[in-house]
């Protein structure tokens, strides 16, 4: 799994600051550009990037937001869920906020789905006028295309494959071997996420550059 990097004191409170920012903007209709900005802010201030492989330390980031991560058996069409409040603290060793990942996911799939579920906490819980502190919250990550899932997908894309770094490594891969299969495999291993996710990121960046 991820190598943990210690934060400098200057950045230790970035997570609490982001939480406060989102609470102050409850009810805001976030654009996908807003989501990108939040993902970039987290990456910039937390310095939560593995220096050897440069993959985002998404487990570390999630835990810094005070969310514990567990694995459980679930139905195959559910990738995970997030639970806050209710009996969560009693069931999960004193943790009031947990993300549960389907234990049939591989490690790279876990990274993508963890990032998406973290976005549920940030934008569907903290940023919602319908949620109050410590109120029970539960949401499943299913294979459906609700508005929050568009936001979740945007957040995962930006935090796991930062655009500048992604373009840089795409160019590195192409110089080594410009065959499509090689580029996909190179980037998938570099960022430690599934090739399907890489395909979409490449297509998105190429479309925006035309």
Predicted feature residues:
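Active-site hotspot residues in diverse enzymes, especially metal/ion-binding acidic/histidine motifs
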Residues: 1-210
């Amino acid at each position: 799994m991820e190598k943990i990097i210690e934060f400098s004191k200057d950045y230790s409170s970035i997570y609490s600051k982001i939480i406060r920012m989102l609470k102050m903007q409850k009810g805001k209709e976030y654009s996908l550009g807003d989501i990108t900005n939040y993902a970039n802010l987290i990456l910039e201030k937390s310095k939560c990037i593995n220096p050897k492989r440069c993959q985002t330390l998404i487990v570390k980031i999630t835990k810094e937001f005070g969310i514990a991560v567990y694995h459980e058996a679930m139905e195959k069409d559910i990738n995970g869920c997030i639970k806050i409040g209710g009996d969560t603290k009693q069931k999960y060793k004193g943790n009031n906020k947990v993300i549960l990942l389907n234990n049939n996911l591989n490690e790279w799939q876990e990274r993508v789905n963890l990032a998406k579920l973290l976005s549920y906490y940030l934008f569907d819980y903290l940023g919602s006028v319908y949620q109050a502190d410590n109120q029970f919250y539960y949401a499943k990550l299913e294979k459906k295309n609700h508005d929050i899932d568009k936001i979740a997908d945007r957040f995962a894309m930006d935090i796991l494959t930062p655009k500048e770094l992604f373009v840089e490594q795409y160019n590195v891969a192409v110089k080594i071997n410009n065959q499509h299969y090689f580029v996909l495999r190179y980037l998938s291993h570099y960022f430690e996420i599934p090739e399907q996710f890489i395909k979409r990121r490449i297509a998105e960046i190429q479309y925006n550059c035309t």
